[in-house]
Amino acid sequence: MKIIILAAMLGGFISLVAPSVAEGQKTLAEKLGYDADAKLLIVHADDIGVARSVNIASARAFESGGITSGSVMVPCPWFPDFAAYYREHQPLDVGIHITLTAEWDYYKWGGISPAGEIPSLLDEHGHFYSTVEEVGTHADPVEVEKEIRAQIERALALGIRPTHLDTHMGSVMAKPELVQIYLKLGREYDLPVLVISGSWLQDAPDDIRDAIAAEKPLLDGLYMMLADDPAKSWSEA
């Protein structure tokens, strides 16, 4: 059994889920009502809320069946716009794309929390850092938990009923303490979190690997898909 998550920003990632199953136990596919060896496809768009154009493209993709799932960047300027769309088009499979970075040179954002409460997450201009490495260097885990919680609560306040948590640029993987917070809040809010096994997990530091290894199901891989990728570059997993 394989579950394939195909995602785009619109461009994004492909993830494979193939958890091992003990004899006599149902596979994940069977628990979802499918045959044990079924291949299931979820098409997922992240970075919703980052720009009006992304919101429009994502809405059209939801309506046409081009995507079946997505995740929103709550701190970004165009999040309220998508939240309004979401409220008028429920139910949609939309998660929270936990955001701790602002990677563009001339288009920036900060946190949902007051700046004075999360100083370790912000640069000298009051914006999130551009890179995951900077998050790992500067971020105070207490402030990270405060900000992630604020993003979840902000989404709930605007009517989003999230189906999962994932992470912009993988920023919650910057150091083990942040991974633990990510998993903790997923359990607290009863939301599945995006976690990856395969070669990524094997190459991760021991403490990060140990924190993630207990989560189920794990994704076997994460692959970017961009709009200009030629069709011939894709093959069945």
What are these regions (language model features)?
Residues 3-6, 18-42:
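N-terminal pre-catalytic segment of deacetylase/amide-hydrolase enzymes
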Residues 6-14:
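Hydrophobic helical h-region of N-terminal Sec-dependent signal peptides
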Residues 31-33, 58-64, 80-93, 110-123, ...:
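Acidic (Asp/Glu)-rich catalytic clusters
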Residues 40-42, 67-71, 91-97, 162-166, ...:
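Structural preference for beta-strand elements that scaffold enzyme active sites
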Residues 45, 71-74, 96-102, 167-169, ...:
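A cross-domain feature marking catalytic cores of carbohydrate-active enzymes
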Residues 53-76:
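A short alpha/beta connector and helix-capping loop motif
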Residues 98-162:
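Active-site gating/metal-coordination segments in enzymes
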Residues 141-233:
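Catalytic domains of cell-wall/extracellular-matrix polysaccharide-remodeling enzymes
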